[in-house]
Amino acid sequence: MSFIFNRETFEDNSFNEVLREKLMRALNLHDRTVGSSSGAMTTGTGAVECSGAAAAGQRPPRSKGGFSKVDILKSGIIVKKVEFPTIPKLEILDLDVSIQSKSLIKGICKVSCRDAMVQITTEIESNLLLLHVNSSPKFTTPKLISNDSFTVPITMTFDKLHLEAITNIFVKNTGVGISFNDVNLDFRLQCSIKLLQSSIEKRLKASMEEVFKDVLPSVIFNMSQRWFTHGETVVPTVDKSMVSSDTPVQPRMILDESDLSDLSPANMLRLSTLVSSRQTLCLNPTAVDTISTIPGCLERQNLHRFNLRFPSLYNYYSNKEQQGAHNNEKNRVEHLKLWGRSSSNPIPTRASFKVENTLPKEVLDSNSYDVRVITAIQTKMYERASNDVVLRRRKIKMRSRKPSKANKDAVSPAQNDSGTSSCSNVASELPHASLQANPQSDEIDPAPEGGPNAEDAYKEELEDSGLRAPQDFPALENVTPVLAQLPNQQRSRLGSPLSAGRPTPLLSPLDDSHWLLQKRDPQDLRTTLYSPIRNGRFYVMPQPQLDTKEASAFLLENGKRFGFVGLLNNHNLKWGNDPPPPYREVSITQ
């Protein structure tokens, strides 16, 4: 069983006009101005325009479940054109007619429609911020300086519309109910705003399931009610919550005044602080001494302030020095410079916040740092760092060094002791040369730095002062030369470490060389031009007479022993509690 559609009905333009009017009324069902036959008027061109507040751009937000939705439509939807170039096909697959007091018809049909075209136009709101502000509570939205409405007209054309679906039809004495199953819909969209064309097409195809499930069945049922009421106008029932008054729509109050007393004052203060902080577009806060505008909250633009206040070696000692200053104005200027502020530059710059973790130069010069404080700061910085960093300790490995050529030629301490005893025996048999000390000077004259003339002049100066050149003594046998292969190097004047004000006697050249040998490493030891150690041989200085009063006379005991530094003391060559020479004074006794 099937129905045959009358071709003349679809070819007549009056059918398209009626269908366009009904489609427009269905699309504007939720608008307060479109709900009756007088809510729309037809122009001379055949287009239907919305009257009232819909044309003026006022549209209440739709509500579902008590929550308002953001609606970008600023006016009603106008259906400008509807065409059916191909006659639709309707095939009845099953039909059940019940003969009862209430007539009821059930059937299953297959609907096929091709090459249909629908063109609609409307106005949308392009300022989405305005829509969100109007539909949000006041305490969560900032106060915007400029937030005006900006409407944009848009026209959409649906052509090459192809529809195939299986429908279940229920016909009662009050209307017709249709449900769609297995819907296959395809169309092409042309939008006046090309930037939104692809996005709108995807959203419409995704929402077609809801259209055939809810929208079309309600439209067909409302239209059928007029037929079953013998042409009487039936106003569709609209929920009272969807109809608004003439006053502007106010956002819904979540909390009443009675509910505010139950809230925590601390939480409300934090919320108000959060709202006030969002009322500016400034990236840098205006306060100088605060890290952020919200206490306990670190913002990204204020991260440099937190880094400056983080304990480091530089800012710890800098703040410590600033606390002890007396000039408050100078401290304020230095504080502003540390933060990158000045009278001409109130907003800090990024380059001025780089602070290195080093001690200030003034602290190092004054030696006023504490090792325990430095350790605590460095430990705290390591603990706050990432856990991926492995702590490394500095290790010092002590290894025995291989003796070099210079060390092989040097005399060991044991050989020095044996050489000392052998030299002391030989010294008792040799004639002595007098050595006179200069009590007015506690420094050793350096060797001349000039040529041969300078050397002769230096020798004459020594002879005038009472120091005679060493005589030709027989060479000491069985004595290992000390540093014979090292080049000669002149030695600067050496100051006496004794207390100032008292003259100290000069050490003998042999004692002086032995003292240098003990103080410095063998590889760093250099002999002077007039050193007793010369050409690998010892020159023995003669012992002065006992009746002389020079301090140098008591360096050698009665001419029997050499007075090497480290061996001469007041305990018969036994080491005692006296400080080691040359850091002691030689007592002069008769």
Swiss-Prot record:
* Positions of region (Disordered): 393-456
The gene name on file is: MDM34
Q: Which family does it belong to?
A: Belongs to the MDM34 family.
Q: Could you tell me which species this protein originates from?
A: Eremothecium gossypii (strain ATCC 10895 / CBS 109.51 / FGSC 9923 / NRRL Y-1056) (Yeast)
> GO CC annotations?
ERMES complex
Q: What is known of its domains?
A: Lacks alpha-helical transmembrane segments, suggesting that it resides in the membrane via beta-sheet conformations similar to those predicted for other outer membrane proteins and porin. The SMP-LTD domain is a barrel-like domain that can bind various types of glycerophospholipids in its interior and mediate their transfer between two adjacent bilayers.
Bilayer topology reads: Multi-pass membrane protein
Q: Please give the Gene Ontology molecular function terms for this protein.
A: lipid binding
Q: Which residues form the SMP-LTD domain?
A: 1-225
Q: Where found?
A: Mitochondrion outer membrane
Residue ranges, compositional bias (Polar residues): 413-427
Per UniProt, subunit arrangement is: Component of the ER-mitochondria encounter structure (ERMES) or MDM complex, composed of MMM1, MDM10, MDM12 and MDM34.
What UniProt keywords apply to this chain's record, in alphabetical order?
A: Lipid transport, Lipid-binding, Membrane, Mitochondrion, Mitochondrion outer membrane, Transmembrane, Transmembrane beta strand, Transport
The primary site where this protein sits is: mitochondrion
Basic residues: compositionally biased ranges: 393-405
Describe its function: Component of the ERMES/MDM complex, which serves as a molecular tether to connect the endoplasmic reticulum (ER) and mitochondria. Components of this complex are involved in the control of mitochondrial shape and protein biogenesis, and function in nonvesicular lipid trafficking between the ER and mitochondria. MDM34 is required for the interaction of the ER-resident membrane protein MMM1 and the outer mitochondrial membrane-resident beta-barrel protein MDM10.
Could you read off the lineage of the organism from its UniProt record?
Eukaryota, Fungi, Dikarya, Ascomycota, Saccharomycotina
Name under which the protein is recorded = Mitochondrial distribution and morphology protein 34
- What GO biological process, any one, is recorded here? phospholipid transport
Q: Which PANTHER family match?
A: MITOCHONDRIAL DISTRIBUTION AND MORPHOLOGY PROTEIN 34 (PTHR28185:SF1)
